[in-house]
Regions:
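S-adenosyl-L-methionine-dependent methyltransferase catalytic core, i.e., the SAM/SAH-binding region
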Residues: 1-141
């Protein structure tokens, strides 16, 4: 899909969302079009707004800004954000393993508080856009 969008963009610039939809539409099954289009627009928004870079920068600052006992509460709205938040809270960095100190002990700045919280049925009924929200809470050690 990306290669088709890029090749079409070389022929005619994409100036409106309608232009992009016209490129995407023939590439997707009609019953899944809305899902595919949403993902394309989400990817563009994430890249244009540098959302993952901003989140990473924010998380890196929290271990220095929060005092011991301070709480970090982060709501993520899609899997890329949630993975970053989860790894940072669990490992103190963005990789899959935590850093070790000179003695081989894991050195993490946060302690996870409870489980991830998702919207209740009542919240979903009142606010459908909350369906993908995940709240993670950690305490500075």
């Amino acid at each position: 899909m990306v290669s088709v969008i890029i090749s079409n963009r070389k022929i005619n610039p994409i100036t409106t969302t309608h232009d992009l939809i016209n490129i995407i539409k023939p590439l997707t099954p009609s019953r899944f079009f809305r899902k595919y289009a949403s993902k394309v627009f989400q990817a563009i928004r994430i890249e244009v707004n540098k959302e993952l870079d901003v989140l990473k920068s924010f998380l890196e600052q929290t271990s220095e800004l929060l005092l011991p006992g301070g709480r970090l509460c982060v709501i993520s709205y899609h899997s890329l954000e949630d993975r970053m938040v989860k790894r940072y809270i669990t490992n103190g960095n963005f990789s899959t393993t935590a850093k070790k100190d000179l003695y081989g002990n894991f050195s993490v700045p946060f302690k996870k508080i409870g489980k991830m919280i998702q919207p209740s049925a009542v919240e979903l009924k009142e606010n459908i856009r909350s369906r993908s929200a995940k709240l993670r809470i950690a305490e500075k050690i």
